[in-house]
Amino acid sequence: MRRFYTVMTAVALTVATVFSGVSTVQAGGYHEYDVEKYVMNQLSAASVPGVSVSIVSDQKEIYSATFGVDGKTQADYVLGNLTQSMTALGVLSLAEDGEIKLEDDITTYLPKYSALKGVTIEKLLHQTTGIKKETMLDQVKAEGKEGIYQNAYVNYSILGELIESVSGETYEEYLTENILDACGMTSTYSLRQNPEMQEEMSPAYKNYFGYPVAAKYQYNASDQWATVSSGYMISDVKDMGKYLQMYLKEGGDVVNPEDIAGVLQNTVPVINKSKEDSLYGTEEAYGMGW
């Protein structure tokens, strides 16, 4: 979630903004010095408090390091929008098992959202429901133009409820059993599920007039704007390296290759984008959680 962190994932490089001091493991064949020099220069230029870096192949972790204030590669941080990619995989897992169809109307499973009659699960995945960004869960309605991408956390909050309703489990339980365990991810959780982990988390940083200011993350169960499934899963950089490996393996033991291709390549254009939706002036498109 951009109000806490920015998490960016590339094909062979995972960079997650957790704010911690240099700790390096398994450099493999990479030139550590060159990697670290580049990262430190970028941190300084961008006035970023810290960053964690993971470089992986589809078979192993090649390099993992944390730069900044904390000094732990195991530092926990809020995944923000990257949580949505996990939620998308959870929904696709249900579809693979024949529990749902992506073209199904969401009200078939969650009739309480009667204002979304005609909105399909696939539209929620693509965020083309017409729900506006500032919409709260208790006031859900499709006010915008359906079929046009608009980033609204409520879309993925509703998908989290779908997973719970269909599976009969909590979102975290289903994700752990069907996604995280298969990826070997043992340090990914939510504070709703594990409130005792509050003190283990690295602080979030917000930018005030060019200066990073630490802010302790607090899970708010009554938050109607964003929920666990739309932005509040927590992880560390080593687990995120494992998550990236699953994509490099085209789904591995988690979902089939066609679904991974669909998540990444079945996209809708991002138009009328804000600065936070823009990446280096490129043309953006949105898949399912990506």
Predicted regions located by residue number:
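Short, solvent-exposed alpha-helical surface patches in non-cytosolic proteins
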Residues: 80, 85-89, 109, 119-128
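Short, surface-exposed loop or secondary-structure junction motifs
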Residues: 114-290
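Sec-dependent signal peptide cleavage junction
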Residues: 18-30
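Short, conserved catalytic-motif segment at the N-terminal edge
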Residues: 29-79, 99-101, 133-142
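Bacterial N-terminal signal peptides that target proteins for export
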Residues: 1-9
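Acidic helix-start/capping segments at beta-turn-to-alpha-helix junctions
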Residues: 56-58, 105-113
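Bacterial N-terminal signal peptides
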Residues: 10-20
